[in-house]
């Protein structure tokens, strides 16, 4: 919200925002401490769905933590663009778009197939102006390794499908914030305190 952040926890079952914090910036430690606070208040946290926050995903090893699949898709698009030209990038984009529609084993196999097909392409190097060897297709490599390294968090829903219903995206919370941002943008002249009051009324009005 331009000059401050609102961190929110929304309960998937009840569809209600159960807590929020207003902070000057967003960081993993705040989320970690907040989860601990909720647990101390006797909340039973059966699973967490979040956007890409590497340390946050790693910290909660005792709680199934699903990475939002659409955030992963967005990460890949930032690396290889929405309309990639190179064949390897086009194929990787198409593969990534299957994230929300397939299972862990199939996706892992397809990613391995893609790598085997393009590993020579990924390994290509050139000498730059500093007279050092650099990978030629750095952005493609970054996109691939992002998928590979995050794979264990992208299918937590699938791994726990018989235990608990975990969504694989944060769309249900993103929609709430999208609606709020649209409303708040109409009142940019409001002072911070009034703006926060408006946001909170909208936030809880969506409960």
Give the ranges of each region predicted by the language model.
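RNase H-like nuclease fold core
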Residues: 1-49, 54, 58, 150-154, ...
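A short beta-strand motif that forms part of the nucleic acid-binding face
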Residues: 11, 24, 64, 74, ...
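Acidic/histidine-rich catalytic cores and adjacent linkers
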Residues: 15, 43-53, 60, 93-207
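A short hydrophobic/aromatic micro-motif that marks alpha-helical segments and, especially, helix-coil
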Residues: 26, 86, 187-189
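A generic structural micro-environment signature
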Residues: 28-29, 76-82, 172-173, 179, ...
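Conserved beta-strand -> loop -> alpha-helix junction used to position metal-binding or nucleic-acid-contacting
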Residues: 47-93
């Amino acid at each position: 919200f331009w000059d401050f952040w609102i961190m929110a926890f929304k309960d998937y079952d009840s569809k209600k925002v159960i807590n929020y914090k207003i902070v000057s910036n967003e960081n993993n430690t705040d989320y970690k401490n907040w989860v601990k606070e909720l647990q101390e208040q006797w909340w039973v946290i059966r699973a967490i769905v979040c956007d890409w926050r590497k340390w946050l995903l790693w910290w909660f090893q005792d709680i199934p933590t699903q990475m939002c699949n659409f955030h992963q898709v967005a990460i890949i698009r930032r690396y290889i663009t929405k309309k990639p030209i190179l064949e390897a990038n086009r194929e990787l984009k198409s593969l990534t778009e299957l994230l929300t529609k397939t299972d862990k084993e199939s996706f892992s196999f397809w990613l391995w197939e893609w790598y085997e097909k393009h590993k020579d392409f990924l390994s290509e190097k050139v000498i730059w102006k500093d007279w050092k060897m650099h990978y030629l297709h750095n952005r493609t490599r970054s996109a691939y390794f992002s998928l590979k390294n995050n794979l264990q968090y992208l299918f937590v829903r699938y791994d726990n499908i018989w235990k608990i219903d975990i969504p694989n995206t944060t769309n249900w919370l993103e929609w709430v914030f999208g609606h709020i941002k649209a409303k708040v943008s109409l009142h940019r002249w409001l002072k911070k305190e009034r703006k926060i009051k408006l946001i909170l009324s909208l936030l809880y009005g969506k409960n």
